[in-house]
A protein has these predicted regions:
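Short linear motifs embedded in intrinsically disordered, charge-biased segments
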Residues: 192-282
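Catalytic palm subdomain of template-directed nucleic-acid polymerases
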Residues: 23, 58-83, 101
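Basic, alpha-helical interaction scaffolds
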Residues: 115-186
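Charged/polar positions within long, soluble alpha-helices
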Residues: 83, 87, 153, 157, ...
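Hydrophobic packing residues in well-ordered alpha-helices of helical domains and bundles
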Residues: 51, 68-71, 75, 89, ...
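Conserved polymerase palm-domain catalytic core
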Residues: 1-54
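Short, conserved micro-motifs composed of acidic
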Residues: 67, 88-122
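Mobile genetic element proteins and their domesticated derivatives, centered on retroelements
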Residues: 27, 39-42, 51, 56-58, ...
């Protein structure tokens, strides 16, 4: 070869199928990577459906306007892939969340997988955040407040031991602020004022313990939104990159603000980030 190394040959040998009832070893460092490789060809071909995979957590989202055929065919495709690759879907743990903002929506059709009906729930915890059917994020805020208050207790204990303010601040950033800001791009802009006040109360308590104000959650959210928007613009493989290109003015090169008919969309990530970048905070 050109590098001076002798050519190498490689051959793979596959054993026959072996059945075991001991289960797979848990806690292996390579397990998430190996499972990701194993499921790499599990893709969703439907145009109006989106499949999100994170290790062994898989979600399938369908955008339904008039017909559910595309969404249901995507579900059938996923079930078929699992059957072909010796993966068993646990239907009892599979949940469906229906997001419908109509005033009087008709009852949704049940989703059937291998003869079992998938339970429809009002909220579901996925990748650490609770998603509800109205996208109000109140249940998620409640969970955040509970976890943050548990950590504030330890801050109070450290303060009673006269720990230095610097260490208290480090403890806050590592254990409390990380909880308050986790996935904040998805939910913070859409929170009601009541929920924002509950989160703000935690930062005020932490500020008193530390001795100086901590970073306001609104400031943290805005800085994070602007940074993420720039990352998306530079990443041509990102699903939202084309959406931003369509919003870019051909004359000035600035991003054109999204037209929002509802406060729900106006306060979501993309419209908010574009307003911040353009310097038109509202």
């Amino acid at each position: 070869s050109a590098s001076g190394c002798p050519p190498q040959s490689d051959s793979a040998v596959m054993s026959g199928e072996v059945r075991t009832n001991t289960g797979a070893p848990q806690g292996c460092v390579l397990s998430p990577a190996l499972f990701t490789i194993y499921t790499s060809d599990c893709r969703c071909a439907a145009k109006d459906a989106l499949q999100v995979k994170f290790s062994d957590d898989t979600s399938l989202t369908g955008f339904i306007t008039t017909s559910e055929s595309s969404y249901r065919s995507a579900v059938d495709e996923l079930v078929g892939w699992c059957d072909s690759n010796h993966l068993l879907l646990n239907v009892s743990k599979t949940k469906e969340v229906v997001v419908d903002f109509r005033r009087d929506p008709p009852p949704p059709r049940p989703l059937i997988i291998k003869g079992d009906e998938v339970e429809i729930v009002g909220e579901y915890k996925y990748l650490g955040s609770i998603i509800d059917s109205r996208l109000e994020w109140s249940a998620n805020t409640q969970a955040i407040v509970k976890r943050a208050n548990q950590r504030l207790y330890f801050m109070r204990r450290l303060n009673s031991f006269q720990v230095s303010r610097r260490l208290l601040e480090l403890f806050y950033k590592a254990t409390v602020e990380s909880v308050l800001t986790f996935n904040s791009l998805c939910f913070f802009g859409s929170l009601r004022e009541h929920d924002k006040a509950r989160l703000s109360k935690i930062t005020k308590t932490a500020s008193k313990l530390i001795g100086h104000p901590v970073t306001d959650l609104q400031v943290h959210f805005e800085a994070k939104a602007v940074k993420r928007l720039g990352t998306i613009q530079r990443d041509t493989t990102h699903p939202l990159c084309d959406e931003l290109l369509a919003q870019t003015s051909s004359r000035s090169g600035r991003l054109v603000s999204f037209r929002a008919r509802t406060d729900r969309f106006r306060c979501s990530f993309l419209p908010t980030a574009v307003r911040l970048v353009n310097g038109t905070r509202t």
